[in-house]
Amino acid sequence: FFQLPVNGDKKKMKWVMTMNINPGCWFGGSATEYFVGDFDGKNFTCPDAHDVKWLDWGKDHYATVTFSNTGDRVLGITWMSNWQYANLTPFKQNRGANGLPRELKLYEKNGKYYISEDVAPEVYALRKDTKDLADASVADAKDLKGVAANMEGAFEIEADVTPDANGIAGIEISNNKRERTMIYFDMKQGKVVMDRTESGLTDFGKQSVPHDIELAWDKQLAAEGKEPARITNSINYKNDFALATWAPLSLCEDGKKTYHVDIFVDKSSVELFVDGGRIAMTNLVFPVAPYENVKLYTQGGKAEFKNLKVHRLGL
């Protein structure tokens, strides 16, 4: 529970209540949602409490906590996992790791308030080496094979992406075992998507056991002749781990044509930030060998990729 200025204006403050829920995630299992409103010292009021707002649009962002003694900034950190499969993931030493620290800010759009959750600026000190890549106009695909080789699977990709107005433009990260994670803009659907169905080890998701409450929801939907919500809300659903998550591009500024993406890749996670954290998306991945290849690709038109950089990270 904390205060944030709206659009950086300290004369216009709002209170934010975060809530870690299990189940209830848009894609199944656990997640963090938030509510923005006013607090008089006793009562918290939120005028749009029925609108679900996710702090992160991936499936592995839970147990978010914020810190004291950070000046006038609000910094948070999350646990990267989901209780649907937290005890099934192929970790040997732990049950998941923390995500990168993030700075939370509040912005207003069309009369409603939303949190942007960008990586904290201190994280950039992890950059060790930078490769500046040439701008690319892509009509099909451009391979950057081995661009992240010798980075031990820990690197950051930055780019300004201008998709075709009705097409798909994406960045694929992969290894030489044909395992890949795809991040793409689907402009016709108005979504940014992260697909981990072929990211590496995924079959453990077949053993996932949803929460009893979620199973009750499934039963109710089945009686109506419908599939479980976690399946219909996901894209390319294979099992409770092998799927794609997505976020609406309406969270970004209206009329946007170019989107800034910042992708942090580690040995078992991919964290995506779009337009300064207006969209954040965190997902676990378990490739059997480190990702080291990048491919720019499009469908249904040409896309521009500019200011493209790959940073080796000291993680």
PLM features: what roles do these ranges have?
Residues 24-27, 84-86:
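Short catalytic/ligand-binding loop motif for oxyanion handling, primarily in non-cytosolic enzymes
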